[in-house]
Structures are given as C-alpha cells and as structure tokens.
Curated annotation (Swiss-Prot):
Annotated Pfam families: TPR_11, TPR_16, TPR_19, TPR_6
TPR repeats by residue range: 63-96, 97-130, 132-164, 166-198, 200-232, 233-266, 267-300, 302-334, 336-368
Repeat recorded as keyword: yes
Keyword Transferase: no
Keyword annotations from UniProtKB, A to Z: Repeat, TPR repeat
Protein name as it appears in the record: TPR repeat-containing protein SYNPCC7002_A0425
Gene3D superfamilies with a match to the protein in the record: Tetratricopeptide repeat domain
InterPro entries, sorted: CellSynth/LPSAsmb/PSIAsmb (IPR051012), TPR-like_helical_dom_sf (IPR011990), TPR_rpt (IPR019734)
Native organism taxonomy: Bacteria, Bacillati, Cyanobacteriota, Cyanophyceae, Oscillatoriophycideae
PROSITE patterns: TPR, TPR_REGION
Amino acid sequence: MKIRETGTRQQHNLRRARIGCVILKKNVTFTMGIRFSRWLVGCGVAIAFGVLSPSVTWANPQLNALLEQGNEQLTNRNFAQAVQHYRQALTLEANNARIHGALGYALSQLGNYSEAVTAYRRATELEDDNAEFFNALGFNLAQSGDNRSAINAYQRATQLQPNNLAYSLGLATVQFRAGDYDQALVAYRKVLAKDSNNTMALQNSLTSLLQLGRNQEAAVLFPDLLRQRPNDAELRIKAAVTWFGLNDRDQAIAFLEEARRLSTRDSAMQIRVGKIYETQNLLPQAIAAYEQASFVDPQSREAFALYGSAAMKTEDYINAIIAYRALTELSPTDPAAFYNFAVALQGRRRSREALEALEMARDLYQQRGDRRGVNITESLMAAIEEG
C-alpha cells in the first residue's frame, strides 16, 4: 500500500511537471544570453521525476530512498542537496540515463554547466533517442560557451522531435550567437512557420538578415515587429538602418525621429541616433540629436564633443561655441577642448576670446609635453594675430 501511495503522489507530480513544461514552452523567452531556464525548469522537473517510475520501485531500497530524497529536494529547489542524493544513487545504479539527467538538471540550476554537460552527455549515451536530454545538453553546452557542440546537440534534439518549437528555437538561437546567420535563418523560419508571432524569432531573423546585407528581406519582417513593440526605440533604429540600405532616406529619417521621440530622456540613445545621422551626412539632424543628448545629460563629455564637432562641420559656429564652452568646463585640463573652442570663436571673428582659449590650450599641451600640440596651437595664434 505504501508503494502505491508513493507512486500515486509521484504520478501526480510528474503529470504536473509535464503540464508545466508544455506551458513554459509556449512562453519561452530568450535574450542574447539565451535565457530559456524557465522552459528548462519545467522540463527538467519532468525528467527528474521520471527517475523513479510512478508505478514501479527499484529492487534496492537504498536506491529508492536516495531517489525519493533527490526528487523531493529538487521539488523544493534545494539543488545542492539533490546533487548529493543523485550522485549517491549513481554509485548504486551507474548506467541509468534518468539519474544522470536528473543530476545534470540539478547541476545546471546551480550554474555548474560544465559538470551538467558531463551528466547530460552520459545520459544521451545511455538513451540516444531522448530528445529532452539532447536539448538539455545543448543548453548547458551553450551556457559553457561551446556553441559548436551545442548546435550539434540541438540538431539531434530537432531530428528526434522535428515539430518541437522549443528545440528549434534553441538551435536557432545558438546558431545566431555563433554567427551562423544563414543556418539560424533556416531554423528561425521553422519556428515562424509554427508561430508567426514569435517575437524572438522575428527579431533574430531580422538581425541575421541585416548582418547578411539582405535588407529587402529584412524589411518584410518589420511591420509585425513594429506592431508588437510600439515603444521599442532600438527596433526603430534597426528599421532606419534597413531603409537607408534600401536608399529610402525619408523613411529611414522617419524611423530615427520616432526612435528619438521614444527616448527623449535617454542621452545614450540620442547619441546613437546622432551618429547614424552623421554617417549619412545628415548633419543638421545629427546636431539636433547631440544637442538633446547634452541637454538630458549635461555632464556628458561625449555628447558635447560630438555636438561641437558636428556643428563645426556645417560652420554652425554658434552651436559649436555653446558645445565647446561647456566641454572646457567639464574638461578643464583637456587642451583639445580649448583648441576647438578657439576655432569656433574665431569662426565668429571673436579673435580676443579665441587667443585666450589658445593660450590655455598651449599651456595644457606644454604641461603634457605634447610638442606637436604646442606647435599647432602657436601656428593658429600667429595666424589670428597677423589677420
């Protein structure tokens, strides 16, 4: 009777774990770090509970006890204790794939990916038709930084279960991380064929296409992504780069301005947009973005330096003076800031102020032992005095 009660309880837990696994597969989320531990938790518990059959107990009472204790610790997320129990169990039953799989799962949850790889690799040797094990092996290999081996493991998982969305997504994401953009696209398209609104598949397909210079194909993916992420400034920047590649400057500018609007209080984002404008020789737009960046973060040396530089390129000396004056206040020991400030002042024929700034620049160059800087500064001073 006791065995039957234990089996019934484990059967309930196993059913619950498997249900959780299915649910988590649908909601799997990835970042560039391939975070799919939420999915792994659900499936790992199912594997771990499968160590001890719901209806059959092992002949060895000591093994039964160790596995029950390991499963209980796993359920309670006491992974270090679970590892101890499973390792002891393996001394009694060394060739059981399920015990190796449970050990691998517990090790993975502790962040010990290299040892988890060893456990899952042994599990796959003992059960070479178990897609769950190959999937878990792929995850831990990827977390260990061995993307090539991870790809092989995921490919085996997808061969065993070609219709499993999570496995295809895992394969695609590791291929993407490894820079295999062509192969990642193939895998992501399989995901999108089953789940056309999968945001991660859409985003990484998009990035893969952009990396491959296939802008026309990338453009097709944007409508769905833009609709799904109406407040994503980063996505608008990618869209802008795509449309610049398609020589549609007006649409690209519209995307960049939308990105700016979505991040008006983000100095770093304003700088990014400004740099894109500058590479496209759209200097008035770049100046506006850099000016906004300096307004949001008045301590940003980078923002003021870029602001001043872009203004000088268009001979917008008033904005250049504003930018470089602020930069000299933020960097009072930077001779280049004073030199550029002087050039901007001279652009407005403010010679006396320009000479004062150049004297400061020369002194700072001398303090640094920068003879070339001193010579350039003195040459400009002489030209102003002669003119």
